[in-house]
Amino acid sequence: MSRKKSAKVREVLADPIFNSVVVTKLINTIMLDGKKSIAQDILYSAFDLVKEKTKKDPMQVFTQAVENITPQLEIRTRRIGGTNYQVPTEVSKRRKQALSLRWLVQYARLRNDKSMDLRLANEIIDAANKTGGAIKKREDTHKMAEANKAFAHFRW
């Protein structure tokens, strides 16, 4: 174990339009090479597309999508007696949010739509409707945890 102090968790400021910390975290997840203004443009135009397609408040659709993607369990590899076990563990609140936003952006990038804002909008809508790649990832993670439930007693 490291003897250094653990790094302090910095406060993330809420974004100016939706006044939400989660939206800022999503912008930071979308951002590549430090180009935050481009990431903001992508997200805000994606929210406009969500509003156009669903006729609902994009923030509500987004929070529903994140809620549907959020994992409860995950698999951690633990080495005991020369054998690696896949141990299911509960996910902390911060990691739940980070994973859900990461999966949302990851599977939006893998889509075949024309632009990133369209891909992201479609992935958010799909996640809110409990379909799409990010939901499948969550289900696969939960299935793996369920399959390895026998090793749950190896927890940290």
Swiss-Prot record:
Pfam families: Ribosomal_S7. InterPro entries: Ribosomal_uS7, Ribosomal_uS7_bac/org-type, Ribosomal_uS7_CS, Ribosomal_uS7_dom, Ribosomal_uS7_dom_sf. GO terms for biological process: translation. Keywords: Ribonucleoprotein, Ribosomal protein, RNA-binding, rRNA-binding, tRNA-binding. GO terms for cellular component: small ribosomal subunit. One of the primary rRNA binding proteins, it binds directly to 16S rRNA where it nucleates assembly of the head domain of the 30S subunit. Is located at the subunit interface close to the decoding center, probably blocks exit of the E-site tRNA. PANTHER family: RIBOSOMAL PROTEIN S7. Belongs to the universal ribosomal protein uS7 family. Part of the 30S ribosomal subunit. Contacts proteins S9 and S11. This is Small ribosomal subunit protein uS7.
